[in-house]
Amino acid sequence: MFENTNPDVMLKMKKYGYLAFWAIMVPLVPFSAFVGVESGTQDYWAWFMYAFIFGIIPVLDYLVGKDPTNPSEDVQVPTMSEEVFYRVSAIAMGFVWIAVLFYAGHIFMNNGYGLLGKIGWIVSIGTVGGIIAINLGHELIHKDPKVENWMGGLLLSSVTYAGFKVEHVRGHHVHVSTPDDASSSRYNQSLYNFLPKAFVHNFINAWSLEKKYLERKGKKNISVHNELIWWYSISALFAATFGLLWGWQGVVFFLGQSFFAALALEIINYIEHYGLHRRVNDKGRFERVTPAHSWNSNFLLTNLALFQLQRHSDHHAYAKRRYQVLRHYEESPQLPAGYATMYVLALIPPLWRKVMNPRVEAYYEGELDQLFRDGKRVNNIA
C-alpha cells in the first residue's frame, strides 16, 4: 500500500504514526472492559486485547504492507536523531503505560470477572505491557541520557523484568547469534525448549554481569551501587502498591501481567535470531555483529506499533541508533511477516519449522557447517 510512497512523505507520516497507532490501541483497553460489562460477557471480552493483537493486527499488517523507506544518511539521519519530538514521544508513552497498568488493576478488581475473565485480563494487559513497557524500555536502555535510561529501567521494573536492562546490553548484544547467548534461538529449536533456558540464564546472567561490572569498578556487589537491587526494589514497590490498593489479588494481577509481558519479550527474542549464527573465522573466532545476524521485518503497521523494533538487523549492528532512523537492509535475512504473525507461528513448532527452516537453510546455502542444531554443527539437513 505504501511501498511506492515518496520517501519524504513516508517519513513525515511515520513521525506521527507511532503515537497515532497507540492513540487508537490504548483506548481499546477501556473499550473492552466497558463492552464486556454492558453485554454481560466480560469474561470473554477480557481476552479482547490479546485476540486483537494476534488475530486482527496480523491481517491489517498484511493489508497495509511494507515500508522500504530509509532516511538519508547525510541529511535526514543527523537531523531526525536530534529531534526532541521522538524522545518525548517515547517517554510520554512510558507514562501512558503506567496509567494503563493502574487502570487495569482497578478493572481487574471491579469488573466482575470470573476466573476465566481474570486470566484473560492478565494475559491481555501483560501482552500490552510486553509491547509498550518492554519494547520502549528496550529502546531507552540503549540511550546515554540519564532521563531516557532511567525511564527504560522504570518501564522494565513495571513488569518485574529489570534484569533485562543489564543482560540485554552487556550480554545479549555481545554474544548475539552465538551458542553463548540464551536469547538467540538455535536452528530447529522449539519455542518451548528455548523459553525455560532463556528465562533462567538471563536472570542469573544479569546478576553475574552486574557483579563483574562492580568488581571492575572496585565496588561491592551487594551495595547501593548495584542497579539491579534498585530496579527490583521498584518492582517490589509496584507490587506493594497494588497490594495496598487491591489486596492479594492486586499483587497476583501485577505479577501475572509481569510474567506475560516477559513471556512476550522472550518469544520475540526467539523470533529475532532464529537459526542465525555469526560465522567462525579461520582463527576460530566469531565474526563481528552485522545486519546479517538478525531477522529483519519491514511491515509498516507492526513497525509503528513497535517503534521499528522489527528493523532489528540495523539495531544490532548499530545499537545506539534511535528508533526513528533505523534502516531496512534488503540483504538481511527477511521474515515473511511482522512480529504479530510470527508470534503465532512460533507457538506451533511444526508450522514454525515449515516456514522458517527453509529460510535458514537458504541463508546458509553452501555453508551447512555454519548451522547449529542442539549446540552441534550440522553437516546435512536431513
Curated annotation (Swiss-Prot):
It comes from Alcanivorax borkumensis (strain ATCC 700651 / DSM 11573 / NCIMB 13689 / SK2). Keywords: Cell inner membrane, Cell membrane, Iron, Membrane, Metal-binding, Monooxygenase, Oxidoreductase, Transmembrane, Transmembrane helix. This is Alkane 1-monooxygenase 2. GO terms for molecular function: alkane 1-monooxygenase activity; metal ion binding. Binds 2 Fe(3+) ions per subunit. It is a multi-pass membrane protein. Fe cation 2 binds at H173, H312, H315, H316. It catalyses: octane + 2 reduced [rubredoxin] + O2 + 2 H(+) = 2 oxidized [rubredoxin] + octan-1-ol + H2O. GO terms for cellular component: plasma membrane. Pathway: Hydrocarbon metabolism; alkane degradation. Induction: Induced by n-alkanes. One of its GO terms (biological process) is lipid metabolic process.
